[in-house]
Amino acid sequence: MEQAVHDEGVTSSVLMLGVREDINELYSMLDTFFMPSLYEGLPVSCVEAQAAGLHCVYSTDVPRESDITGTGIFVDLTADYGTWSNALEEMYIRDRSTQNPELLALRGYSAKENAEALTQYYERLVIE
């Protein structure tokens, strides 16, 4: 990856940050999350970005299930730069969503509910 960044001549525009424990702090510095990916399963980074209240722009190769808030925009990777730029403009036109945490909770992604479910699961394992 670093070689590709160097070969493309964009080293001054790309930061390779490695494994991080402060992802939530990084997300808080962003306005929009882009995922122009060729292949993905269900990327956790998309869920994290939405939980941080970011608008998300995904490639059409990212599963639609990743957009759990239903507020993302999907753009084909073969689309021209103008199409991607228009998606970015649309995100800036939209207000930064303050409802994403509530949307996530409504869809079963509440940290509290998941912690309770995990606790119950472990309690059942101990009893058995």
Protein language model features and the residues they cover:
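Nucleotide-activated donor-binding/catalytic signature segment of Leloir-type glycosyltransferases, i.e.
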Residues: 1-18
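Aromatic "clamp/platform" in nucleotide-sugar-dependent glycosyltransferases that forms part
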Residues: 19, 38
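An anion/phosphate-binding loop that grips the pyrophosphate of nucleotide cofactors and donors
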Residues: 30
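A short hydrophobic beta-strand element within the catalytic core of glycosyltransferases
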Residues: 33-34
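Short glycine/serine-rich donor-binding loops of glycosyltransferases
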Residues: 43-50
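Short hydrophobic beta-strand element within catalytic cores of glycosyltransferases
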Residues: 55-59, 64
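A charged, aromatic-enriched C-terminal amphipathic alpha-helix characteristic of glycosyltransferases
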Residues: 96-128
